């Protein structure tokens, strides 16, 4: 699964794991990505989105219709 949120655009970050002796090794910090299905009344169908936890909260606040309208305007395939 791609580690990118379709709503916020959040992707992986990169940094170091630091051991007790302070040796640094490269690592990747992945966002909390979930697949979630919503019923979209304006489209009259279900839409499955790949979302971060922040993206889910954004949909809770703004509403699924507003978020899907923005995604369609950006050209995201749903």
UniProtKB/Swiss-Prot annotation:
Belongs to the bacterial ribosomal protein bL28 family. It comes from Micrococcus luteus (strain ATCC 4698 / DSM 20030 / JCM 1464 / CCM 169 / CCUG 5858 / IAM 1056 / NBRC 3333 / NCIMB 9278 / NCTC 2665 / VKM Ac-2230). The keyword Ribosomal protein applies. Pfam families: Ribosomal_L28 (PF00830). Residues 1-30 are annotated as: Disordered. The gene is rpmB. This is Large ribosomal subunit protein bL28. It comes from the Bacteria. Keywords: Ribonucleoprotein, Ribosomal protein. InterPro entries: Ribosomal_bL28, Ribosomal_bL28/bL31-like_sf, Ribosomal_bL28_bact-type, Ribosomal_bL28_sf. GO terms for cellular component: ribonucleoprotein complex; ribosome. One of its GO terms (molecular function) is structural constituent of ribosome. One of its GO terms (biological process) is translation.
């Amino acid at each position: 699964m791609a580690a990118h949120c379709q709503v916020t655009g959040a992707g992986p970050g990169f940094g170091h794991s630091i051991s007790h002796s302070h040796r640094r090794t490269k690592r990747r910090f992945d966002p909390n990505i979930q697949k979630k299905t919503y019923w979209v009344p304006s489209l009259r169908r279900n839409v499955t989105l790949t979302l971060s936890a922040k993206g889910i909260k954004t949909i809770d606040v703004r509403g699924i219709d507003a978020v899907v309208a923005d995604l369609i305007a950006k050209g995201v395939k749903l």
